[in-house]
C-alpha cells in the first residue's frame, strides 16, 4: 500500500491564490481530503506547488485532481536536497477531467 509523504511537518508554498482569497482557496486546502475544498491558483501559466519535507522522501505515485476544464497540460516533478538546485525527476500529462488521477508509478528524488 502507498503511504502519503505529506505530514504535519511538511511545509508548502504555492505560486498564487485566486484573487488572493486565501480563506476560500488557500494552500491549506491542498491536502485536507475534502471534496468541497481546493487550492485555486490565479490566472496565468506556470503555476506551481513547492513541498519541503522533514526528511528525504521517495515518490512512487502522485494523486492529483483538477476542476474539469482547468487542468494542466503538462506537469513536472522536480526534486532536490535542501540547499541544492531543483532537478527534473519526471514529467506527466494529466487528463482534463474532474476525477482523481494517479500520475506516476515510480520516481526517485
Where do the protein language model's features map onto the residues?
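Intrinsic disorder/low-complexity segments enriched in polar/small residues
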Residues: 4, 20, 29, 37, ...
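Disordered, acidic Ser/Thr/Pro-rich linker "stalks" and the adjacent N-terminal cap
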Residues: 1-52
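Aromatic, loop-rich ligand-recognition surfaces of beta-strand-rich domains
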Residues: 33-88
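Beta-sandwich interaction modules
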Residues: 46, 51-54, 89-109
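Sequence-pattern detector for short linear motifs
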Residues: 16, 76, 108-109
Amino acid at each position: 500500500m502507498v503511504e502519503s509523504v505529506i505530514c504535519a511537518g511538511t511545509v508548502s508554498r504555492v505560486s498564487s491564490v485566486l484573487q488572493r482569497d486565501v480563506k476560500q482557496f488557500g494552500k491549506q486546502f491542498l491536502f485536507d481530503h475534502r471534496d468541497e475544498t481546493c487550492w485555486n491558483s490565479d490566472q496565468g501559466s506556470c503555476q506551481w506547488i513547492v513541498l519541503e519535507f522533514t526528511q528525504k522522501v521517495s515518490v512512487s505515485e502522485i494523486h492529483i485532481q483538477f476542476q474539469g476544464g482547468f487542468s494542466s497540460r503538462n506537469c513536472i516533478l522536480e526534486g532536490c536536497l535542501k540547499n541544492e538546485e531543483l532537478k527534473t525527476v519526471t514529467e506527466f500529462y494529466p487528463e482534463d477531467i474532474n476525477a482523481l488521477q494517479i500520475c506516476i508509478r515510480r520516481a526517485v528524488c
